[in-house]
Amino acid sequence: MRVRSGDDPAVDDPENSTFSNRVGRDPSHRLRPAATPRARVRSGPMRITTVGCGYLGAVYAASMASIGHEVLGLDVDQKKIDDLNKGIAPFHEPGFEKVLTEALASGRLRFSTDYADAADYQVHVICVGTPQQINGSGADLTYVHAAVDALIPHLDKCPDGRSLLVGRSTVPVGTAQILAQKLKDAGTDTLLAWNPEFLREGFAVKDTLYPDRIVYGLPDGEAEAAEAKALLDEVYKPMLKADTPLVTGNYPTAELVKVSANSFLATKISFINAVAEVCEATGGDVSVIAEAIGLDDRIGPKFLRAGVGFGGGCLPKDIRAFMARAGELGAGEALSFLREVDMVNNRRRDHVVNLSREMLGGSFTGKRIAVLGAAFKPDSDDTRQSPALYVASKLSGRGADVTVTDPAANERVRTERPNLKVAEDAFEAAKDAELVLLLTEWDEFKELDPVALKEVVAEARFIDGRNVLNPAAWREAGWDYRSMGRP
C-alpha cells in the first residue's frame, strides 16, 4: 500500500534541523483499520540506536541526529568509534563529515562499543553488512544475527515504552521472519519492522534526508503493525510531512523491494552494455542508441551509459544473493536471467583487458599503463568489486607496470593492492605511459586536456572505459582513442 498526498517532494534546508510541513498527508490513507497502539510514542525527538557504523549506519546516525533525534551509534570497532566521536569520517562521502560534526556538536549524537548503552533507547536500527558468502553466492547474515543477539539483553528496558527493532540491511527474503521468531524465543516484547535503505554512494546524506520513497515492512498482526508504523512515522516525521511517498507491506515485500530495485538497475546497465557489444561488431554508436531509447518515458535515460560495468558493495552481491535465495525457495528459474546480467557485467571488464592487449601489440610484459580511477564510482572511496581495480590487477598480473590514481581511494589501493603503483594525479600516473585507461568517471578525469596529457606519455593510446570523453577532441590531439561501443 502506498501513502501519498501530493506531487511536490520538495523539502526545506536540512541544516535548519527541521523540514517543511506545508504539505500534509491525507488522513484518509490508512494502513489498516484503526487500532490502538500499545507502544508509547514520544512526542518529539525519538531515541534511536544504529547498530553498525560503517557506510550505511554512520550516515544514518548523523542524518537522524541532524533532524533532531537523539542517536547512539554502536559498533564493535573501537578505532572507528573513537574516530567518529572526534568527527573523523572513516570513509569518503560528500557532505557526511559536516553533518557528523554538527550532530556531535549539538549533543544529539554519540558513538559507543557498549551495547548496554542501548537500554535507554526505543528504536534500534540494524545497519550491518551482509557480504557475499565466501564459499557461495548467498548473503552472509553473520553480522545481522550477531547484532540482534547483542541487543536482545538490553531490549524492553526503555522508559519511553515498547521497543522497535528496524532492519535496514539488505537481506534475503525470509530473514525478517527468522529475526521476529528470534525475538519471540528470547522472551522480548520488542517489535520488528523492515525499512530497506536506497542510498547511493556519493549522495548518501541527500538520500537519507530527502528520500524519494520510504518503505515499511510491518508485522502481520493488526495491532503490532499499527504500533510499529506509529514509531516509524515518528522517526520519519519530517520526511512524511514533506510528502515523501510511503509504501507499506509485510516483511517479505519489504525485503524483496530492495533486491528487486538493485536487480532492475543491474539489468538496465548490462542491457546497454550488451548493446555496446553489438555496436562494436557493427559500427553502431551505443551512446546515440541510449539517448534515443532513453527519450521514451517508459524507459528513461538513467543507467543507460555503456562502459566497463558496475561494481560496489551492492549490485553484484545483491543479484547473486537474489538468485541464490530464489533457488533455495524453488523459484530459481524465475531469476535465471540475472545470471546473464552478471556475465555481461564481468565480460565488459575482460573486454577492456583484451582491448588493452590489442592496442599494445599483443603483449603486456614491461608495458607502462596508467589507470585513472580505483573506486567503483566517483565521489566515493569504495573499492569493493571495483571494475577499475579488477582491470588494473589483471594487467599487472599479466606483466604490465601499472600505476593507478584516484582522488579518494589511493590509500585503499595502497592497502588492498600493494602490487600496484599509486600516483597523486592523472599527469603523474600517465608519465611515460604507453596506454592510459579511464575507468572511474571522476570530474577531474572528464576535464583532462588531451593536448597537455599527450605531452607526458610515451605513446598516445587511450581507452575511455566510461564513454565520458569527446572522441573527436582526443583524436584531433593525436590520440589513438577507443571507447565502449562507439565508433
Regions found by a protein language model. Give the residues of each.
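Structural/interface elements that position substrates and couple domains in central-metabolism enzymes
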Residues: 33, 37-487
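Intrinsically disordered, low-complexity proline-rich regions
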Residues: 1-45, 367
